[in-house]
Amino acid sequence: AIYRGLVGSEMCIRDSDYVDWEVELVAVIGKEGKNIPKENALEHVAGLCVGQDISDRPAQFATTPAMFNLGKSFDTYGPMGPALVSLDLLENCESLDIECKWKGETVQKSNTSDLIFNISSIISYLSEIVSLNVGDTIWTGTPSGVGIASGKFLKDGDILTSSIEGLGSMENKCVRISDHSRANIVPEFMKGFLKD
């Protein structure tokens, strides 16, 4: 298995009962820029790919205020693939069907036209804050249907399949690893979201 590459067949999840999924459209920067006008933003994109934004919910809510990025930062979280597709191969990169299946069940289904902020707006805004460099990845957000909303979470052996129109599908098998961490210490307020 490839654990830190663009795409791999297995995704190690830490020994936690509350690891969640989010399918996302990922833009990969191909031309550096700062203060990029919205109308020129797509000129800075090398291509798009599918991203599986994996989140360990207890790690996110372990502190006050919550630190959402912390729960997404474990080794092997955030696989991307199956290929980097250039914008000229897509009819409209701002309107692509997006879907996630967990163990064969469709749990997320939408279109990137439903994003709160489209790709161009996100790139332009971010470039006002930080310079964008070649190879930077911008994850654009996820539709409804993440596991925490229904009390469903990734387990050892689960298959997660994420697809975006024109970009292909990426399938990963979840493999549980032990890491001697505070994996299942759940903050009190979060317990109402979780089902036994």
Predicted regions and their residues:
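RNA pseudouridine synthases
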Residues: 29-31, 36-51, 57
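Short coil/turn connectors at secondary-structure junctions
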Residues: 15-16, 21-24, 43-46, 94-96, ...
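A generic local secondary-structure boundary/capping motif
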Residues: 14-19, 24-25, 33-40, 68-72, ...
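Single conserved hydrophobic/aromatic residue that forms the stacking wall/gate
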Residues: 1-13
